[in-house]
Amino acid sequence: MAKKVTGFVKLQIPAGKANPAPPVGTALGPQGINIMGFCKEFNARTQGGDMIIPVEVTIYADKSFTFILKTPPAAELIKKELGVERGSGQPNKVKVGTITRAQLEKIATTKMPDLNCESMESAVAMIAGAARSMGITVKD
């Protein structure tokens, strides 16, 4: 028989840098799970990375937990690919960079397992939309 699920929490934590302070402690503390146990396991599974990692934590009735690591957000992958610090505050007026089709395909390939799309073409279109909303010019 499967364990009874009592909670489900989504977090975005820098790879290898989970600690009991907020946001981890405030999200997981009320659920009653071992926060240090989560932090140690998360850090072990994400060591050596420098990206923000989305994680989905499932909490069971016996206060045990499991978690699934997702791919980094598209905006983080775009910023890393272009080497920009942040997107534009006025994306329609101020552009912060240019991204090529090859770079979009590379990011879409990385992000594909977590995207809600069937083809690579639609994945590239989703990533291109994220880039445009950050003030990045998409070059075909």
UniProtKB/Swiss-Prot annotation:
Top-level taxon of origin: Bacteria
GO terms for cellular component: cytosolic large ribosomal subunit
GO annotation terms (biological process): translation
Keyword Iron: no
UniProt keyword Ribonucleoprotein present: yes
Key words, A-Z: Methylation, Ribonucleoprotein, Ribosomal protein, RNA-binding, rRNA-binding
CDD domains linked: Ribosomal_L11 (cd00349)
A GO MF term: structural constituent of ribosome
InterPro entries, per the entry: Ribosomal_uL11, Ribosomal_uL11_bac-typ, Ribosomal_uL11_C, Ribosomal_uL11_C_sf, Ribosomal_uL11_N, Ribosomal_uL11_N_sf
SMART domains: RL11
SUPFAM superfamilies reported in the protein's UniProt record: Ribosomal L11/L12e N-terminal domain, Ribosomal protein L11, C-terminal domain
Reported modifications of this chain: One or more lysine residues are methylated.
Subunit structure: Part of the ribosomal stalk of the 50S ribosomal subunit. Interacts with L10 and the large rRNA to form the base of the stalk. L10 forms an elongated spine to which L12 dimers bind in a sequential fashion forming a multimeric L10(L12)X complex.
Main function: Forms part of the ribosomal stalk which helps the ribosome interact with GTP-bound translation factors.
Protein's name according to its UniProt entry: Large ribosomal subunit protein uL11
Species for this entry: Gemmatimonas aurantiaca (strain DSM 14586 / JCM 11422 / NBRC 100505 / T-27)
